[in-house]
Amino acid sequence: MKWEEWKPFYERIVKEMGYSIEEDRRAAELLRDILMENDNYIIKEELNSIIMQKVYVFGAGPNLEEALKKGDFKDGTKIAADGATSALLEYGITPDVVVTDLDGRIRDLLEASRKAVMVVHAHGDNMDKLPLVVEFPLVLGTCQTEPLDIVYNFGGFTDGDRAAFLAEEMGAKEIVLVGFDFSGIVGKWSKPWLRDHTPAWESKMKKLKFARELLEWLKNNGRAKIIEFSI
């Protein structure tokens, strides 16, 4: 998804969610500055080299654990969306890529970063967490405003749908969604403070609505075939 295609979605999201475009821009610039100073960033062509034709994107929905118990996932690149990283590690699976706005369990993100490329997303609400990226060996920066030179915007809003847009941008031919659920139940892996699956709160419902709409857009407009993992 190009910026011109993403912009109308973004403007709707900002209006409905009450976000600040200026704060989002500040966050993108801050992430860029940190990555440039620390020199631990990669460019998209480097990430492209590790993405296989088949990509599994792991969301943190309530059906994730059952999928991890029965799936193999060795025939494709494994991209974990933030909180799903903790579930994968618990089941002995190391993701190849983690897409995160640093909202998951930090210790698990740090563990995963030893082997995974960390795709870190900057927005107005996580500027205080962005200095953490200096702890990650390899980082690809993303944002939700206009892209900068080393901070990209491939489209997508939540960690899960952004991961799918990332896979599309990297040339995947097939994207398998694992642990995605739009029924209104939030999986316990979604937030570090959750102890069990729980009904979605108002802002989360809005995010799920946008995520579903964006994935439908990707199915209809992207090159990759997008399917849901079946147990």
From Swiss-Prot:
GO molecular function: 2-amino-4-hydroxy-6-hydroxymethyldihydropteridine diphosphokinase activity; ATP binding; kinase activity; magnesium ion binding; thiamine diphosphokinase activity
SUPFAM superfamilies for this protein: Thiamin pyrophosphokinase, catalytic domain (SSF63999)
Co-factor requirement: Mg(2+)
Top-tier EC class: transferase
Catalytic activity of the protein: 6-hydroxymethyl-7,8-dihydropterin + ATP = (7,8-dihydropterin-6-yl)methyl diphosphate + AMP + H(+)
InterPro entries: HMPDK_MptE, MptE-like, TPK_catalytic_sf
Biological processes annotated in GO: thiamine diphosphate biosynthetic process
Enzyme Commission no: 2.7.6.3
Keywords associated with the record: ATP-binding, Kinase, Magnesium, Nucleotide-binding, Transferase
Keyword presence, Magnesium: yes
Keyword Nucleotide-binding: yes
UniProt family annotation: Belongs to the archaeal 6-HMPDK family.
Function per UniProt: Catalyzes the transfer of diphosphate from ATP to 6-hydroxymethyl-7,8-dihydropterin (6-HMD), leading to 6-hydroxymethyl-7,8-dihydropterin diphosphate (6-HMDP). To a lesser extent, can also use CTP, UTP, and GTP as the nucleotide triphosphate substrate.
HAMAP family: HMPDK_arch (MF_02131)
Official protein name in the record: 6-hydroxymethyl-7,8-dihydropterin pyrophosphokinase
Originating species: Pyrococcus furiosus (strain ATCC 43587 / DSM 3638 / JCM 8422 / Vc1)
